[in-house]
Amino acid sequence: MVEPLCNKKAAMIFQELKVECETLFEFKIRNAIPIHRGWLNLKWKLETDAGSFVLKQYNKERYKMYNQELLIQALQQQQRLHNNGISCPKLLTYKNNVMHISKNNERFIVLEHKEGNLISPGKLNEKEIYSLGKAIGQMHDLLNDGSLIEGEKPKFVPPTKENRLKHWEDKRREAEQLGKEHILSHIILQQEATQLVNIDQFYNSKKGWVHRDLWVDNFLFHNDEVSAILDFDRMDYDYVELDIGRAVISCALHDGVLNKSLVASFLAGYRNKLDIPVGSIVRAIQMLWYMESTWWIHANMDQHSVPPSRFADEMSWIAKNYGVLQKMLADL
């Protein structure tokens, strides 16, 4: 397990990166405010004589988990999206590099600071979610315009039904051995939903370059419009519907109810740029669940912090409604 850095170490890293930034980008940092969001990577809002920016340091241990070539490609694509009018922050470059390395081998990026507000899961209004759908459609269109070579195979490889059922049986046994009766119902729910899965339909889903982390913490909104799509670090070649399912569940599910009019508004925005067949949102949500459920539902889920707890709730909701999603959303 990679541990977060202590405040003293973080302060030392900032002092080093402050000097680097002022040298590379020829601005003077007047104030720096830590941003306490994200896992392990350090972030600060910089107020400078050239405007406001965000400094992001890549944790050395976490960086080892990245495919480094894909990460650089993702940052370069973020820059291309920005240059083509998509709402995502511009990166400051030095000698055409989007990522920079300090004397002590700290990797970092500097982005323009985008104005806007975070909105809680399921709390978007129809104008906001329409704007988001439109921006994601434009993003998917640009990422797959031929500038990038098509990936060899999607990142997500759906396991067989038998493998997944065995997984849930193992988790069920683990919860029983730990005496966690309160978690058993969540695991049994996943088992029951898995019985309904048709794996073949997932393979028919369109493949392409996608963001892979489209949840509310990575969106900013201003005046009923999306002002920023953030954090392209996980961008990869995958099933396009996974992006759609992730955004819809994050933005339209609230208090155990999926707001159908919000889902419709998102899809209307998306179709402003790209076609998505009527009813395919059902498969998008089902496939999202098949990919993510094992990440969030397990014997130790009672120790989740707030975001994983929300994701676990989403997975439980999809599992509970897996068989009725078709009836609920087939006309969208």
Task: Locate predicted features.
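Conserved NTP-binding catalytic cores of kinases and kinase-like/nucleotidyltransferase enzymes
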Residues: 1-88, 92-93, 331-332
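ATP/Mg2+ or Mg2+-diphosphate-binding catalytic cores
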Residues: 5, 295-332
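ATP-binding pocket architecture of kinase catalytic cores
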Residues: 48-148
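A glycine-centered beta->alpha junction motif in the catalytic cores
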Residues: 60, 108-121, 171-173, 290-309
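A cross-family kinase active-site recognition segment
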Residues: 122, 126-180
